[in-house]
């Protein structure tokens, strides 16, 4: 069940995260507002909202920004109405790509996303064309300085599906329905997580190199740079040696 964070690892190496902090805030604020609208403004009774708030705190978002986003979602403040859509398609080399968006203008967004696919040697597909290649899972990441055996035992006892160590992290995998329960149970035992999210994990990966690898990274960058895009998932793999050539 490994490999879900390939793009995150690459972004970290490229040093791209800090440069896009403003866009990260915008995306999290959208998620908080939509979560509050759908499930109410109480994080204790709304797991999706609680997860979004935790992510905001992890990015050091000011408390006032979080509270305003919740109020916009619950109707306490005037705000934009967003629609959630998932676009699917193929990148270079036949890589499967899922794009989650929140938009107030469906026509504008689909035009932007389709343009990015086309310019990066990919193409958009019909709904359902690649979604079956991914599994929705909770992923909780920890520093490798923690005792793996202790974390492994505690995680399985709390209801986790699997625990693996890779890319200088220990990752605990859960079903989406037990994600919050497992995360909180481990935190109560002193295991502080670095990140925690519900994400889409590819069942298989497509190895890329050369021009295809460059085009795929360009596609990921441009999609994430799109204001309406919340998350991008793709089942590509680029070796460390290949990354060194492109850096």
UniProtKB/Swiss-Prot annotation:
It comes from the Bacteria. GO terms for cellular component: cytosol. Signal peptide: none annotated. Its main location: cytoplasm. GO terms for biological process: regulation of DNA-templated transcription. The keyword DNA-binding applies. The keyword Protease does not apply. SUPFAM superfamilies: YebC-like. Coiled coil: none annotated. Keywords: Cytoplasm, DNA-binding, Transcription, Transcription regulation. GO terms for molecular function: DNA binding. It is found in: Cytoplasm. Belongs to the TACO1 family. PANTHER family: TRANSCRIPTIONAL REGULATORY PROTEIN YEBC-RELATED, TRANSLATIONAL ACTIVATOR OF CYTOCHROME C OXIDASE 1. NCBIfam families: PRK00110.1, PRK12378.1, YebC/PmpR family DNA-binding transcriptional regulator. This is Probable transcriptional regulatory protein Glov_1245. It comes from Trichlorobacter lovleyi (strain ATCC BAA-1151 / DSM 17278 / SZ) (Geobacter lovleyi).
